[in-house]
Design a protein with these regions (language model features):
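Solvent-exposed alpha-helices and their adjacent loops that cap or buttress functional pockets
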Residues: 37-40, 89-90, 161-166, 174, ...
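Cysteine/selenocysteine-centered motifs that mediate thiol-based redox chemistry or coordinate metal-sulfur cofactors
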Residues: 89-103, 208-238
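Generic structural signal for well-ordered alpha-helical scaffold segments
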Residues: 156, 196-200, 225
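Intrinsically disordered, low-complexity regions enriched in acidic/Ser/Thr/Pro/Gln residues
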Residues: 2-170, 174-175, 181-182
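Short, solvent-exposed amphipathic alpha-helical segments in soluble enzyme
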Residues: 62-63, 72-73, 188-189, 197-200, ...
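Extended, folded domain segments that form the structural surfaces/walls around functional sites
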Residues: 141, 152, 189-193, 225-235
Length: 267
């Protein structure tokens, strides 16, 4: 399932840079024996927008162009992918160059205030976390317990860097039980940003998030709620966003909007 789609339109040109996702090291186990194993190949990526340095992200590097596009989207620096002419990633220098068509309006003002969040130690967002939250309107999407169990099984069967090297988080986008996109990174905020970038390059039906289900490993932090609904359960309740956590096998907890979940106690 490739995250890249070529529409032959005026969507951004992407460099499609590649880098190894894991590297081998030697470790000593509890018996004093040396073992060769794989660990995630975390690397720094400095993002430049129209030659202006914006931020440095620590990333696995699986789909860096989509990460950068989604980061700019979720930071509300862009409102459309068509504002971007190209994204070029060069791993030799650890940099991503974003070229826009007309620049980003008031970028200095928009990036002047940075809020550090709880996202894996490096999470941060520009501006007010709560800005425009009241204007978000969600559709009437829901899911059944059977769909929930189905998507959890799909995650369990998914081939992943986590299974081979550990120490990464995974995020996925579902339509019902059908997995549309699965992304891993060293931080969940990176993974959801990458999915946000991926969605922007898809057809209109896939871009529409109102009927989709978002899955993430780890905790449902305020940053994850903001990015998936665009802050904690309190905000999820206010928006009517259904937040389900501690989901494994057939156990889960629904923290907000339980009316969106069709209960099936017979399962």
């Amino acid at each position: 399932m490739s995250p890249f789609v070529d529409h032959g339109t005026v969507l951004p040109r992407l460099s499609r840079a590649q880098a190894p996702l894991t590297r081998e090291i030697l470790a000593v186990n509890e018996f004093g024996e040396t073992e060769r194993l794989s660990i995630p190949a975390e690397r720094a990526l400095t993002v430049y927008v129209d030659k202006r340095e914006l931020v440095t992200l620590m990333t696995l590097g699986a789909h860096p162009e989509l990460l950068v596009l989604g980061y700019l989207r979720n930071q509300r620096l862009l409102t459309s992918p068509f504002e971007v002419e190209s994204i070029t990633v060069d791993w030799d220098v650890g940099a991503a160059a974003v070229k826009t068509h007309r620049g980003i309006d008031r970028i200095e003002e928009k990036t002047a205030r940075r809020v550090v969040t709880t996202g894996c130690g490096q999470g941060s967002v520009f501006g007010d976390l709560m800005a425009d939250v009241e204007e978000i309107r969600l559709g009437d999407a829901g899911l059944t317990q059977a769909q929930l169990y189905g998507l959890l099984n799909a995650i369990r069967l998914q081939e992943s860097t986590y299974k081979s090297a550990g120490s990464v988080h995974g995020c996925a986008l579902f339509a019902g039980e059908r997995m549309l996109c699965f992304i891993e990174d060293v931080g969940r905020h990176n993974a959801i940003d990458t999915i946000a970038g991926w969605m922007w390059l898809q057809d209109a039906a896939t871009q529409r998030g109102s009927d989709k289900i978002f899955y993430t490993t780890g905790r449902l932090t305020s940053e994850m709620i903001i990015k998936s609904a665009q802050m904690g359960v309190q905000v999820a309740e206010r928006l009517g966003l259904c937040a389900i956590g501690r989901a494994m096998n057939k156990r889960f907890l629904c923290y907000s909007a339980p009316g969106r979940l069709r209960w099936q106690p017979e399962l």
